[in-house]
């Protein structure tokens, strides 16, 4: 397996190859493996010194100097699939859902292609595109009611993407995007030019009333965050 991955940033309306991360330690060590991170020469010359959205992170200023760490860079760890999405992606890859850190690199190369934000792993984006399935839109009611067509489509083409979206954790959740036709699509299947609104959709877990209550109250906290000036 490739011991390096290409990092892409979304800038000026397009995904740009801006640098890479290479393993210097054993892949089996997972995120604890030593790494070498650097920007491409072209990107470093064009955006030298930047710590804004043109950088991997604010503590990784753009430049020609490389970064060596005793583990993965933190921004890369943040893109590693976790929780429910990790389990679904492991199944998709034919691996045990209890697999530990030794499969972290394989998960990254398949599961960091549709992260929230402007940073992604190019190899993971390519893997996701090859496994995306047919483009299909759904009405709000079909999503809310979890109709048969939506549930079947999601099981075949969507749940494993939860691990690559950055909306991770133990709750089943996915990213949906509304297109110009008013329908909702799995975010990774819709081209950027058609996107109008973006949503995080979280599903309930079984018939546990306590968990259902937690889910219902999240809307109130979102409204409170909006009142406080947060963009939610």
Annotate each predicted stretch with a short phrase.
Residues 1-232:
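Phosphate/dinucleotide-binding and metal-coordinating scaffold of catalytic cores
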């Amino acid at each position: 397996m490739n011991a390096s991955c290409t990092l892409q940033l979304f800038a000026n309306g397009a995904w740009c190859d801006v640098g890479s991360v290479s393993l210097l330690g054993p892949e089996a060590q997972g995120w604890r493996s030593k790494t070498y991170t650097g920007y491409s020469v072209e990107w470093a010359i064009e955006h030298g010194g930047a710590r804004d959205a043109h950088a991997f992170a604010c503590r990784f200023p753009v430049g020609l100097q490389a970064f060596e760490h005793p583990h993965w860079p933190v921004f890369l760890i943040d893109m590693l699939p976790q929780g429910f999405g990790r389990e679904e992606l492991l199944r998709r890859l034919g691996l045990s859902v209890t697999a530990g850190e030794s499969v972290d690199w394989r998960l990254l190369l398949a599961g960091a292609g549709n992260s929230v934000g402007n940073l992604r792993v190019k190899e993971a984006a390519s893997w996701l595109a090859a496994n995306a399935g047919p483009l299909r839109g759904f009405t709000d009611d079909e999503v809310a009611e979890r109709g048969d067509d939506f549930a079947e489509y999601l099981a075949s083409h969507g749940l494993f993407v939860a691990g690559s979206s950055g909306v991770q954790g133990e709750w089943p959740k996915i990213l949906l995007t509304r297109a110009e036709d008013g329908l909702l699509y799995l975010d990774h299947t819709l081209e950027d030019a058609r996107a109008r609104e973006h949503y995080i959709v979280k599903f309930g877990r079984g018939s546990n009333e306590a968990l259902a209550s937690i889910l219902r109250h999240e809307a109130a906290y979102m409204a409170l965050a909006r009142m406080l000036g947060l963009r939610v």
